[in-house]
Design a protein with these regions (language model features):
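N-terminal signal peptide c-region/cleavage motif recognized by signal peptidases
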Residues: 14-18
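Sec-dependent N-terminal signal peptides
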Residues: 5-13
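Bacterial extracytoplasmic/cell-wall-associated proteins, especially those involved in peptidoglycan
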Residues: 22-219
């Protein structure tokens, strides 16, 4: 029943594997570190959906946002966070890519590069300013790691591994791969907050669209 409401099946024809995602996935900037099983899950899902290499970066950025913002939420709750992120990408008030939307906020330059006046701009290192981002996990000062398994023993952390797989899968669907389309269950929301933790001052100026799990969605 849930898939009929949130995930609409699409027709995919002639899909054939073109190589391992583990081989195709190149180095790129993203916010979180992935444990070995988190990487394996990512590669498995990219392979299954036959996602072209050029789409990997945006998929990972969205998947990380879903995971850190809604790890403990249901599939419906995770899809809702994905939809808010997508709605922002499609809204001219926000940047036009998933990575830019997720990482939006003021930055500061690292002292390591700031001390070199003649260093080219593309070689400078910047970090987000603490607690100044659109999505709090990205600049809360904590090290972001997707712990799908324990570091020493390698044992799977079932809840985290499942949440990461769901986040990756939803992100793949949002990007038009994997055979399902993610319908907007937030009714066009571009804001949300965790109502069990906080009531933000800006909420009084926004319109409520829906409540899903521990998040209130607004536009």
């Amino acid at each position: 029943m849930f898939k009929k409401i949130i995930f609409t099946a699409t027709v995919l024809a002639g899909m054939t594997a073109t190589g391992s995602a583990a081989e195709k996935l190149k180095s790129f900037d993203h916010a979180a570190e992935l444990t070995s099983q988190a990487k394996t899950i990512l590669f498995q899902e990219l392979n299954t959906a036959d996602v072209p290499n050029k789409g990997h970066q945006q998929i990972v950025c969205l998947a990380e946002n879903i995971y850190f913002e809604a790890r403990a939420e249901s599939m419906e709750g995770k899809a809702a966070v994905a939809n808010v992120t997508r709605n922002r990408v499609e809204d001219k008030r926000w940047p036009g890519t998933y990575c830019e939307v997720v990482q939006q906020g003021p930055v500061r330059e690292s002292w390591k590069t700031k001390q070199h006046a003649d260093l080219p701009d593309d070689q400078r290192i910047y970090y987000p300013r603490k607690h100044r981002c659109q999505f709090s996990w990205y600049c809360d000062g904590k090290k972001d790691i997707i712990w799908a398994n324990k570091e020493k023993s390698g044992l799977t952390i079932e809840g985290n591994a499942r949440a990461w797989r769901e986040a990756v899968r939803i992100s793949i669907y949002v990007h038009g791969h994997g055979g399902f389309r993610v319908n907007d269950n937030t009714k066009g929301a571009v804001y949300y907050y965790a109502h069990n933790l906080v009531y933000p001052t800006w909420a009084d100026q926004k319109d409520l669209t829906v409540i899903i799990g521990n998040h209130t969605f607004m536009k």
